[in-house]
Amino acid sequence: MASLSGPISPTNLEMFKPGVEELNPSKLLLLSYHQEGMLYPTILGSLELLSFKKERSLNLQRDKVCLLHQESQLLKLRGTGTDTTDVLLKQPMATSVNCCHDGIFTILEQDRMPKTSMAPILTESSGSLVTRLMSIPRLTFSIGTQVAMRLFRLGFRLARYSLRVTILKAQEGLLLIPDLLHAHPVEPLVQDRVVEPILATEPLPLV
């Protein structure tokens, strides 16, 4: 107690001075951003400072893109005698809609060009092609039938044997048609077509 009642030395006064924390440059920078109304991370570290700078640069880049678009639209209207006061009011609304959160500026989609439909053309071409393909077997079968009749009349054994094998294979194919249609469906025009019997006309001369 006696020591406390005596004179206080300068060293004792320094012990009672409140400690003042020195702010480093990064904290001062964050505080200046806070005064401008910007948000900053709660942890004052180097990683948070880098992420904050990156986010702020993206925001500035997005604003720059939107402002450039607005100025370019006004420059186009300048010198044409158009009143740009109404454009100044409407342009920020369109800019806020077109500016995405990731900084990418999207252009409003213009009226699409009318596309010519190719469906009727393809249908007509496919129909004519199917008709042409259906006429080819009919002509082939008519010629083959006439030749087969002449060969049977002449009595060539080899010709008759080959014709019998061909006819048996054709009959086997006719029996397998329903299964083939389920595995490989074809167009209704070909599937629903009724095979008409071919009448033999005048016999063709054998070469």
Swiss-Prot record:
The keyword Endoplasmic reticulum does not apply. The keyword Cell division does not apply. Keywords: Virion. It is found in: Virion. Disulfide bonds: none annotated. Its main location: virion. GO terms for cellular component: virion component. The gene encoding this protein is included within the N gene (alternative ORF). Structural protein that is not essential for the viral replication either in tissue culture or in its natural host. Belongs to the coronavirus I protein family. This is Protein I. The gene is N.
